[in-house]
Amino acid sequence: MSDIVWAIKPDNDSSEKMFLRIQNYASELQQAAELNYVAKIEETANAISLNMEQRKNIYLIFKESIYNAFKYAEATEINFNANYDGNMLTIILSDNGKGFDPQKTNSINGNGLGNLHRRAKEIGATLNVKSANKQGTTITVTLPI
C-alpha cells in the first residue's frame, strides 16, 4: 500500500526520487543478508520527470526483480545501472545468482515474469530478460521519454 501512496504523490515525479526508493529497498535487503548491491545512476537519468504510472511500474518491476534475485536466485551481488541518452531511459539490473531458463517459466499466464512484462507494456517500455542456469540474470527496461 505504501508503494501506491508513494507513486501517486506529485512530489515524487522525478526519476531521482524513484531511484532513491529502489536503492532504499535494496538497502533493506542488503542489511538482512550478505548481499552486495551496487547502483550506478548517470546524472542524466536522475533529471527525468516521470508520470505516476511510469514511476509505479518501473519501481515495482525492479522491486520484484531485486527480491527475486535475493530470494530465489540466491544472488550475492546485484548491479543496478540507469542512463538516459536524450530520448531513451535504460535501466539494467544484473545479478550473479543461479539463473534460470526464461523459456521454461510460466511467465505469460502466471506471476513473476508475466507481471514484469505487463508492467513494462503498460507504460510503453520494453523489458528484456537474459538468464541461463548458473550464469545469473540481467533484466533490461528501456522506456522512450
How should each PLM-predicted stretch be described?
Residues D3-S15:
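Flexible helix-coil linker/loop segments in the cytosolic histidine kinase module
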Residues E16-Q54, K121:
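Helix-loop-beta hinge of the Bergerat
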Residues R55-I78:
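Conserved ATP-binding N-box helix of the HATPase_c
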Residues E77-N87:
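Short beta-strand/loop element within the Bergerat-fold HATPase_c
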Residues N83, K130-G136, T142-P144:
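A short beta-strand-to-loop micro-motif at the C-terminal edge of the catalytic HATPase_c
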Residues D95:
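Acidic ATP/Mg2+-coordinating residue in the GHKL
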Residues K98-G99:
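Glycine-rich G1-box
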Residues K104-Q135:
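ATP phosphate-binding glycine-rich loop and adjacent ATP-lid/helix-beta elements
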